[in-house]
Amino acid sequence: MIFSLILAAAAGTAAPAPGPVIALVAGEGASQCLPDHSLCLEVPPVEDGDASEAVLRVTSAGSAPASLPLPAFAAAETVALWPTLIRGKDEGGAPRYLVGVLSGQTSMYSGGGGSASQLHLLELRAAPGAARLGGEAIELPWDGSLMIRACFSEADMKDRMEACHDEYEYGAGLTAAASSGDAVFPTLAYRAVATAFPRTSRRSDDNSGTRLKRADLVRAEDPACSYDRVLRYDAATAHYELDQPLPDCSDYTVP
């Protein structure tokens, strides 16, 4: 996704610093594991595409796998594991994490289509042999990709220099922010980047009659939907709070 490319370019070849946001590694089959394989997770494919039947399969060292039902996510057509864990403070000696689940939707249009997903962070108490899911700490728009037909006549093709589809991309990432003090879960930094092609296109506008210039035929960031937010965990509500509300970027995040 576009955010991953931006992050990789900024990081160069430097090794990632250790911290509470842990990238999972491939385990047995389709499972994703902590680097030491002490905990492995999987969201198996659901039968008949029924996302309401999705479960989180948890395997700890020395314990039998447990299948924990996932909550129903509104409008979800697909459910997948986010390949990252966020480490919190242990509870009674048992590890505590936030596990990410991506719920997705797709739409098809005449001459185009789109997809999008949302990230749900759920509390996971991972005591060996007694794993259980808690509530949702936050839901965030995660990615979106849309292509919309914009030429309906030969005149449109000429006016748009044969760029006959508008393309919209949205990508986000989460990293650990500043020290979280005594908070149960770490403070997080959320960054979103949205782009449009051609650079003048906006999904909420009628772009079909727009006369484009050669300079418009580039992919450009939309500053209204490219932004940063800080997320702080509130133990009283068991929920993350944003430092500012999210802008309305449904042009990018709703297919």
Regions found by a protein language model. Give the residues of each.
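Acidic, small-residue rich beta-repeat scaffolds with periodic aromatic anchors
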Residues: A14-L34, L124-P255
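Short N-terminal edge-element motif at the start of the domain
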Residues: C40-Y109
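Solvent-exposed loop and beta-edge segments used for protein-protein assembly and interaction
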Residues: E91-P95, G114, S180-V184
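Contiguous hydrophobic, core-forming segments of folded domains
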Residues: Y97-V101, Q105-R125, R132
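Short coil-to-beta strand junction motifs in C2/discoidin
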Residues: G49-E53, G113-L119, E221-S226
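Sec-dependent N-terminal signal peptides
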Residues: M1-A11
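Generic N-terminal initiation segments characterized by hydrophobic and/or small/turn-forming residues
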Residues: I2-S4, S67, A130, A137
